[in-house]
């Protein structure tokens, strides 16, 4: 029985799964935490990865492994492969002005890369490095992403020329063309200030980036692309993830080029594209409201379902931490439309859910405006199991919603990719994440989405 391992190295933790490469049967799993912060020494990731590998009994009986990770993080190495400074993660916003400068210098950057730059992108962080730590920028001889660096460390190589990546993670750098699968040297040169730097080679998803006959490491991927593969998303699917923040992405055969910067034109893991939009406020809003009302999450769901669609006219814009889609970092939350008649806990609970779902729907609506066609909706993430969230999502989107069972989709996607390379099949394995729950659309389509879209645009 060939075995594969898949790793999800996220901002919060590292998780590993071991699966039968042919059937997908889960054989083992482990996880370890990562330190908090937006600036982290990559040595912590490496230590945690070594820990979970030890927890599953090592890699001696593992035929192949794939590593997926948080996107955008800047890991800068010197000529000897040593880390020059702590990695700046995707959620480090000190590079916002650097992003604006590069967007101004390359007015067609969204046509070149599929995305306008924001602070999260690697190119923005590289420019920040040049502007604020010129001595470190001058020493840079390799720029890698978190998953690239971990794959390279796992290989045991000491040469920066051996670092490899895949197109999905590279597409989040801001200096990569996902159509030709090649780096754009002019953007990187403008960001860093010199061209004496090595970038990871791009490896196909069904090939190994490292194979010494004993240890085989697949190309790896960015976390969203790996999650899409892990959950079984296919062309035309819209995936909505409701964690602390919210993410909407679709599988498309055409790259998007959004001049507004609200939609990132990423690549997926298989050769298609992954237009993606984020909202900063999702399940954290539900936590805040349950704490305010002094109720459990289950009680919050029941309370929201007691209210009529539209929450009696209450509009809840849940921008507690600013917002990314639309890009309003200084936005604040607002509740309006309150009257003596509608001001009750049930309407507040429902308005909170409607506000979060409408925020995600606004992000997804940008896909349609860019020509991305979607049909099936997959609802994933911690809040996806909530009955009120499920029902309200069907009403806001006006169609059935599919809810996969809980799982480690990012790690599973990395394991699938490793199995794909190991088994040398034309397509990735078909083993899936289990039976999806279908939440049917009731036919009740309140006008709340229009109200929220108008309020969002007026911010």
Each model region followed by its residue ranges:
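Glycine/Thr-rich phosphate-binding loops that ligate phosphate moieties of nucleotide
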Residues: 1-31, 66-104, 135, 252-257, ...
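ATP-dependent carbohydrate kinase catalytic cores
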Residues: 171-273, 310, 343, 388, ...
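Short glycine-rich phosphate-binding loop at a beta-alpha junction
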Residues: 61-69, 118, 142, 216-218, ...
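N-terminal phosphate-binding loop and adjacent alpha-helix
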Residues: 26-61
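Short acidic, glycine/serine/threonine-rich loops at helix termini
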Residues: 76-79, 154-158, 163, 212-213, ...
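Phosphate/pyrophosphate-binding loops at sites that engage ATP/ADP/AMP, CoA/4′-phosphopantetheine
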Residues: 49-63, 132-137, 185-195, 363-375
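Gly/Ser/Thr-rich active-site cleft segment
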Residues: 9-11, 109-224, 318
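Active-site phosphate/pyrophosphate- and oxyanion-stabilizing loops and adjacent acidic/basic residues
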Residues: 127, 148, 264, 287, ...
């Amino acid at each position: 029985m060939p075995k594969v391992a898949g790793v999800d190295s996220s901002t919060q933790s590292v998780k590993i799964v071991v699966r039968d490469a042919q059937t997908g049967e889960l054989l083992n799993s482990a996880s370890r935490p990562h330190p908090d912060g937006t600036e982290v020494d990559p040595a912590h990731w490496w230590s945690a990865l070594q820990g979970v590998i030890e927890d599953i009994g090592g890699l001696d009986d593992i035929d192949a492994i794939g590593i997926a990770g948080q996107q955008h993080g800047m890991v800068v190495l010197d000529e000897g492969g040593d880390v020059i400074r702590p990695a700046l993660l995707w959620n480090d916003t000190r590079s916002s002005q650097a992003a604006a400068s590069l967007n101004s210098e390359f007015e067609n950057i969204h046509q070149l890369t599929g995305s306008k730059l924001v602070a999260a992108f690697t190119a923005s962080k590289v420019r920040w490095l040049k502007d604020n730590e010129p001595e470190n920028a001058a020493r840079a001889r390799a720029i890698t992403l978190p998953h690239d660096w971990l794959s390279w460390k796992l290989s045991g190589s000491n040469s920066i020329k051996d670092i490899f990546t895949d197109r999905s993670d590279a597409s989040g750098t801001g200096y990569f063309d996902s159509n030709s699968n090649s780096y754009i040297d002019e953007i990187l040169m403008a960001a860093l200030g010199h061209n004496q730097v090595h970038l990871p080679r791009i490896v196909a998803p069904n090939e190994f980036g490292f194979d010494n006959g004993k240890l085989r490491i697949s190309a790896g991927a960015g976390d969203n692309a790996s999650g899409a593969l892990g959950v079984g998303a296919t062309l035309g699917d819209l995936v909505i993830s409701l964690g602390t923040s919210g993410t909407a992405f679709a599988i498309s055969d055409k790259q998007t080029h959004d001049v507004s910067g609200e939609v990132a034109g990423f690549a997926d893991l298989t050769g298609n594209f992954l237009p993606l939009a984020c909202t900063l406020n999702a399940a954290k809003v539900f936590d805040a409201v349950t704490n305010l009302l002094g109720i459990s999450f289950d009680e919050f769901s029941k309370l929201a379902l007691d209210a009529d669609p539209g929450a009696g006219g209450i509009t809840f814009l849940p921008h507690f931490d600013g917002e990314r889609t639309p890009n309003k970092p200084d936005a604040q939350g607002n509740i309006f439309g309150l009257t003596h008649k509608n001001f009750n806990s049930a309407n507040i609970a429902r308005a909170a859910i409607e506000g979060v779902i409408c925020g995600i729907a606004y992000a997804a609506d940008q896909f349609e405006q860019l020509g991305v066609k979607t049909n099936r909706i997959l609802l994933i993430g911690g809040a996806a199991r909530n009955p009120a969230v499920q029902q309200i999502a069907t009403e806001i989107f006006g169609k059935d919603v599919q809810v996969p069972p809980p799982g480690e989709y990012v790690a599973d996607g990395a394991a699938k990719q490793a199995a794909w390379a190991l088994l040398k099949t034309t397509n990735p394995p078909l083993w899936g994440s289990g039976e999806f729950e279908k939440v049917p659309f009731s036919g009740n389509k309140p006008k709340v989405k229009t109200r929220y879209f108008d309020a969002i645009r007026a911010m």
